[in-house]
């Protein structure tokens, strides 16, 4: 008999990968705002950000992948939406599990390296202070704290995975924007594009969950290579049979950013954004390698196969 698993966020980028990877080994029930579209037999239609349920099925494993990201809030209302989805969605899920007498053995929470609140640094580990101050980061920090207490009080094994930029087929966010820009010929590199960034392959995250959840704890997951912008640009351009993007000299980029400072929020780039783009930011996944033999793929080796 397959182990039962409750999955939130199955329609999202990472959630889809988790569903496809684990469905052969687990009896999966999904939770989502829309009807079941995932090819499995069981689905609970509900909006976790706004409602609770007393009818969740008893499952040994809960994987909470639903969340809100990739949007810079333009108003207090949009900022509040991060808390509704990331924090209160988590609270409502846990309260629904309790009301349904469906406390799991394992709880897996998909979090983010944004909780550290750093824009540059090398091999930042899990001991770093949680200084994230954006609505996205704060809502994830508060959800982590809530789950730590909730799971601890109920003897539930909690696994928190803090993820950087996630790569895979048709990725969202900045990586997706880079792919679209290079494909259309409208992408411009900046300077030497030597800044390195941590990334991780979605399929690797999905595949390691069954092993990692038995260890429990808090872990960064990365591909361990941390490619430079130039390596990502070259990989994407080669796979798409496009020219390697032209580069703007750093001096000109700084001038453009200076104009952006004057334009305010309307500007696509300013000095702060330029600094983030051109600064190395990597995270240490050594704890995961030691705890459950995390052996990820290099994203630049995998990315060309899905473009």
Describe these PLM feature segments.
Residues 116-117, 159-177:
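Flexible, glycine-rich beta-alpha linker
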């Amino acid at each position: 008999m397959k182990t039962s698993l409750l999955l939130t966020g199955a329609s999202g980028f990472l959630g889809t990968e988790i569903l496809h990877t684990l469905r052969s080994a687990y009896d999966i029930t999904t939770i989502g705002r829309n009807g079941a579209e995932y090819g499995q037999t069981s689905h609970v239609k509900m909006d976790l950000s706004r409602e609770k349920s007393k009818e969740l099925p008893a499952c040994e494993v809960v994987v909470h992948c639903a969340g809100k990201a990739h949007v810079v809030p333009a108003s207090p209302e949009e900022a509040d939406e991060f808390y509704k989805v990331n924090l209160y969605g988590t609270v409502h899920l846990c309260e629904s599990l309790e009301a349904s007498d469906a406390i799991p053995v394992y709880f897996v929470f998909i979090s983010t390296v944004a909780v550290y609140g750093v824009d540059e640094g090398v091999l930042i580990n899990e001991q770093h202070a949680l200084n994230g101050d954006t609505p996205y980061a704060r809502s994830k920090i508060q959800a982590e704290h809530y789950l730590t207490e909730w799971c601890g009080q109920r003897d539930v094994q909690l696994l928190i995975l803090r993820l950087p930029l996630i790569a895979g087929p048709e990725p969202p966010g900045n990586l997706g924007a880079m792919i679209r820009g290079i494909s259309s010929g409208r992408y411009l590199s900046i300077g030497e594009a030597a800044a390195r960034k941590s990334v991780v392959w979605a399929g690797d995250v999905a595949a390691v969950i069954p092993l990692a959840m038995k260890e429990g704890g808090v872990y960064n997951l990365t591909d361990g290579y941390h490619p430079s912008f130039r390596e990502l640009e070259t990989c994407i351009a080669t796979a798409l049979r496009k020219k390697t993007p032209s580069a703007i000299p750093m001096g000109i980029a700084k001038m453009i950013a200076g104009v952006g400072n004057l334009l305010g929020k309307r500007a696509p780039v300013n000095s702060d954004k330029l600094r983030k783009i051109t600064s190395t930011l990597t995270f240490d996944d050594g704890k995961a390698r030691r705890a459950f033999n995390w052996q990820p793929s290099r994203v630049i080796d995998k990315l060309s196969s899905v473009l």
